[in-house]
UniProtKB/Swiss-Prot annotation:
PROSITE patterns: RIBOSOMAL_L3
Protein name: Large ribosomal subunit protein uL3
Species this chain originates from: Pyrobaculum calidifontis (strain DSM 21063 / JCM 11548 / VA1)
Transmembrane residue ranges: none
Signal sequence, renumbered to the chain: none
Keyword Ribosomal protein carried by entry: yes
UniProt-listed GO biological process terms: translation
Encoding gene, per UniProt annotation: rpl3
Start and end residues of each stretch annotated as Disordered: 228-255
Function: One of the primary rRNA binding proteins, it binds directly near the 3'-end of the 23S rRNA, where it nucleates assembly of the 50S subunit.
InterPro entries: L3_arc_euk, Ribosomal_L3_dom_3_arc_sf, Ribosomal_uL3, Ribosomal_uL3_arc, Ribosomal_uL3_CS, Transl_B-barrel_sf
Coiled coil: none
Length: 338
């Protein structure tokens, strides 16, 4: 028997095509069904400010360090309140089973900054639109709100808001969801209204862009020895595939790297604060600025560059052994940004 040669393929076909994301604002395709006993939004949006390290009391009962202080790397998200601009109802299309929007109601006078991104009339007849929504209350299967970020309240220094759609969940009753969504119309929602410290969330963002890269950096291809038999190149693959078929998608090839939408599951919220001065370094976060209002401390890293919009979502696949639901005890947060 000859020597068995086995090597895992380079890269993953699960993330093809490796091209730039269509929009820097993440598009969430899946939302979980949660039962909290009260209606709530299933997600929130915040801006990535930077990373710090914090001293936290380990609250995992099975950990050898249970009850002791440990150092954790944390990501700081600038989370100004979201403005609820509209309510939208969905029903099922009888021909294909897809969800289709059947009506929406906008706040009578949208914020001026919202006109930077959307073409809106001077005023909406909110009462008329709400009456029209009542006709679809019996056939509605999903309730969502259109929210706008408020970057003027962040440390970015931009004015144009991002607009995204967030479902209402927490209870199985559609009537309760509709009433809750209508009650939010024209109001703001803070991170404390959606999440609690200690819970797990999914993080969705567009990663840092790296531009056009070769196979070594893009796929981790082995660099060939620099001798005469490899005179045609060293930072390249030995072959790009057979003559037929002419194109092999499984073969590592150079191309776009980064600026892809990615989802990371089950990040734990360590703290939700109201005063960003508590955790902002003396000189501000590098390449970001000063956090003026609410913030979120997440354990671990988050995809994307500073100033990038990050969408937080209730977890779609929470672990069987979830960490304690109680609020973690954060002893100290560094004032030195990573």
């Amino acid at each position: 028997m000859g020597l068995k040669i086995n090597r895992p393929r380079r890269g993953s076909m699960g993330v093809y095509p490796r091209k730039r994301a269509a929009d820097i604002v993440p598009r969430v395709r899946t939302w979980p069904e949660v039962n909290l006993g009260k209606p709530t939004l299933l997600g929130f949006a915040a801006y990535k400010a930077g990373m710090l390290h914090a001293v936290v009391v380990d609250d995992r009962p099975t950990s050898p360090l249970y009850g002791k202080e440990v150092v954790k790397a944390v990501t700081v998200l600038d989370a100004p309140p979201l403005y609820v601009a509209a309510v939208r109802l969905y029903t099922l299309d009888p021909t294909n089973g897809y969800k289709v929007a059947v009506g929406e109601a906008w706040v009578s006078e949208p914020p001026a900054d919202l006109r930077r991104v959307l073409t809106l009339p001077e005023k909406f007849d909110t009462e008329k639109q709400l009456k029209a929504l009542e006709e679809y209350r019996d056939v509605a299967v999903d309730v969502r709100v259109l929210v706008a970020t408020q970057p003027r309240l962040s440390g970015i220094g931009k004015k144009t808001p991002e607009v995204l759609e967030i479902p209402v969940g927490g209870v199985p009753s559609i009537d309760e969801r509709i009433n809750f969504a209508i009650s939010l119309l024209g109001k703001t929602v803070s991170p404390k209204d959606v999440f609690t410290p200690g819970q797990l969330v999914d993080v969705i963002a567009v990663t840092k862009g790296k531009g056009y890269q070769g196979v070594v950096k893009r796929f981790g291809v082995t660099i060939l020895p620099r001798w005469h038999k490899h005179r045609k190149g060293h930072r390249r693959t030995g072959t790009i595939g057979p003559q037929a078929p002419a194109l092999m998608f499984t073969q590592p090839r150079p191309g776009q790297m980064g600026f892809h939408q990615r989802t990371e599951y089950n990040k734990r919220i360590l703290k939700i604060g109201d005063n960003g001065a508590e955790i902002t370094p003396k000189s501000g976060f590098p390449h970001y600025g000063v956090i003026k209002g609410p913030y979120i401390l997440l354990q671990g890293s988050v995809p994307g560059a500073r100033k990038r919009l990050v969408v937080l979502r209730y977890p779609v696949r929470p672990p069987k052994k979830a960490p304690p639901a109680a609020e973690p005890q954060v002893v100290w947060v560094s004032s030195q940004s990573i």
